[in-house]
Amino acid sequence: MSFQQEVSKRRTFAIISHPDAGKTTITEKVLLFGNAIQKAGTVKGRGSNQHAKSDWMEMEKERGISVTTSVMQFPYNDCLVNLLDTPGHEDFSEDTYRTLTAVDSCLMVIDAAKGVEDRTRKLMEVTRLRDTPIVTFMNKLDRDVRDPMEVLDEVESELGMACAPISWPIGCGKEFKGVYHIHRDETILYESGHGHEIQEVRIIKGLDNPELDEAVGEDLASSVREELELVIGACPEFDHELFLAGELTPVYFGTALGNFGVDHMLDGLTRWAPAPQTRQANERDVEATEEKFSGFVFKIQANMDPKHRDRIAFMRIVSGTYDQGMKMNHVRTGKNVSISDAVTFMAGDRARAEKAYAGDIIGLHNHGTIQIGDTFTQGESLKFAGIPNFAPELFRRIRLRDPLKQKQLLKGLVQLSEEGAVQVFRPLQNNDLIVGAVGVLQFDVVVARLKAEYNVEAIYEGVNVATARWVECDDAKKLEEFKRKSQANLALDGGDNLSYIAPTMVNLNLASERFPEVQFRATREH
């Protein structure tokens, strides 16, 4: 197969949803249909030893939430799908936001009983920045749900996207009988209890087929016909160009737990979602089909494998081909490195990557030299734009139970901050270590990982910090004056960037009024 064909068959997407909308279950079922897992793991099987394939840290296993992003690759139809699983828990935002910079499309999972929820809104704001195409799956139809038309209206009004239903539910809850596939003009009947295998489904051709009345009952059949007349009249038809521009989403209905409807959605996603896209670098736009290799690191994860005790930098290949043993240029450091041990992923199982193409995600072993946002190329000096760092919203002082382990504590915190799990600030005037996070659960993760991975027992104390900002100033003289007068509020973050730590928002506002030449930034590009 030619290089162009290899690139054009790639589909790299992430799943976004509110916690508990069924994202991990969908991930499982997508892998099942991609034959990647023969038996879909019982997710959150309380007490059972089968943990979902994509949840791998101890804490995730205990809590049944996906804490870290993992990558899974599998073939489907004539495509090769790279699925990036993003944390579903409310806290894990930074990692999730960055993952969304590494994909070409997204699958939005909505709990049809609840509609559009808060976390979905936040994630959609991020996809909006890049006009990412979105495919929608309305989940949990085997439970009692809201009126589907109402939920579609909510997606349109709250997320600003037109909805084009591709399938439509027949009943819901105990009365859920299946879906009518609008494009294929056929009804696919649902049978419950097939969570772990792909079921043989019965298909009835045509909406006016009397077999439909026999299968679902006359009342339900006639109300579905009426509903569909309304739906087809009121909803826009699927338009591929609007979809690619992020303005319209195809909508599928089903139940991931009941293993139903996921394959219809995958058919649509592989057919319509874009192959690897052109990427903006600060210097120029880079086409996926360019021969020369380029890629950027969007995530670093420590200790993915208890057997290996290592850190992996996840890299999205933007253009060209990775070949085992090839030399590439690490743009930030200016060094040429030879990479012979990159890995590909299949839900926690890794394999050595011999070859990978634009659109693929590979893992590089990282011994502390690679940072989030780093670019690797075959010589050209490029920096890919738009990989964000967010100012944390919650702060704690971290203290050791054993003061002799200060060195290990600092090492652990800096490594955890490099992978984006948390941010660490070292005030210039004292030896405190302040940890900043976007959500409360991140604090628990840090203490658990410090203990498990660095053998450091740490505890938190409250600290008088309301917010932090990264400080920039083009005028060196003014910056020195600012540093002299604001010494008590200044700190260095994990990457030694100057930061301003404000005890109150009022304090921050006063500082920015007193020093108009200084910029206080709430986000920082890596």
Swiss-Prot record:
One of its GO terms (biological process) is regulation of translational termination. Pfam families: EF-G_D2, GTP_EFTU, RF3_C. Keywords: Cytoplasm, GTP-binding, Nucleotide-binding, Protein biosynthesis. SUPFAM superfamilies: EF-G C-terminal domain-like (SSF54980), P-loop containing nucleoside triphosphate hydrolases (SSF52540), Translation proteins (SSF50447). GO terms for cellular component: cytosol. It is found in: Cytoplasm. Residues 8-277 form the tr-type G domain. Coiled coil: none annotated. GTP binds at residues 17-24, 85-89, 139-142. The keyword rRNA-binding does not apply. One of its GO terms (molecular function) is translation release factor activity, codon nonspecific. PANTHER family: PEPTIDE CHAIN RELEASE FACTOR RF3. NCBIfam families: prfC (TIGR00503), PRK00741.1 (NF001964), small_GTP (TIGR00231). Increases the formation of ribosomal termination complexes and stimulates activities of RF-1 and RF-2. It binds guanine nucleotides and has strong preference for UGA stop codons. It may interact directly with the ribosome. The stimulation of RF-1 and RF-2 is significantly reduced by GTP and GDP, but not by GMP. Belongs to the TRAFAC class translation factor GTPase superfamily. Classic translation factor GTPase family. PrfC subfamily. HAMAP family: Rel_fac_3. This is Peptide chain release factor 3.
